[in-house]
């Protein structure tokens, strides 16, 4: 599933633009939604983020690796950059506590994420995208 340079740039700058990606997980105690400021497009088949907080989202991933990621940016919609203003990604996460994939994810993060307190103890999370669409169900632009 090709992800355009435009979408890559929007997602990479989501936190700085005030439109962070939200990660939805579910576990034995119910669902959880967490902002993930480190979310990036890893490649055309994956999103990735750096798990530093190690709280409810990580606990839920220990029970169920299925996730949803939503990106909402009303300014991009108003400016005509992103028609619906919303993107949804559904997929399966894989946790990388060590090894080459952890290091590869870390290398792709923005500098503010690489130097953030606790970054050295973070976990790389790679999300295989199984389907993605805008909020109206249209394919990614």
Where are these regions (language model features)?
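Binding-site signature for planar aromatic cofactors or substrates
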Residues: 1-141
């Amino acid at each position: 599933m090709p992800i355009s340079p435009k979408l890559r740039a929007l997602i990479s700058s989501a936190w700085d633009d005030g439109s962070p990606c939200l990660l939805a997980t579910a576990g034995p105690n119910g669902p959880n939604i967490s902002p993930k400021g480190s979310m990036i497009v890893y490649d055309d088949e994956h999103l990735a983020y750096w798990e530093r907080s190690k709280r409810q989202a990580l606990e839920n991933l220990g029970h169920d690796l299925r996730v949803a990621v939503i990106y909402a940016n009303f300014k991009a919609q108003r400016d005509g950059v992103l028609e619906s203003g919303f993107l949804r990604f559904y997929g399966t996460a894989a946790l990388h506590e060590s090894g080459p994939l952890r290091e590869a994810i870390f290398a792709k993060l923005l500098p503010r994420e690489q130097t953030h307190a606790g970054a050295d103890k973070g976990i790389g999370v790679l999300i295989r995208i199984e389907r993605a669409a805008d909020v109206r169900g249209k394919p990614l632009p």
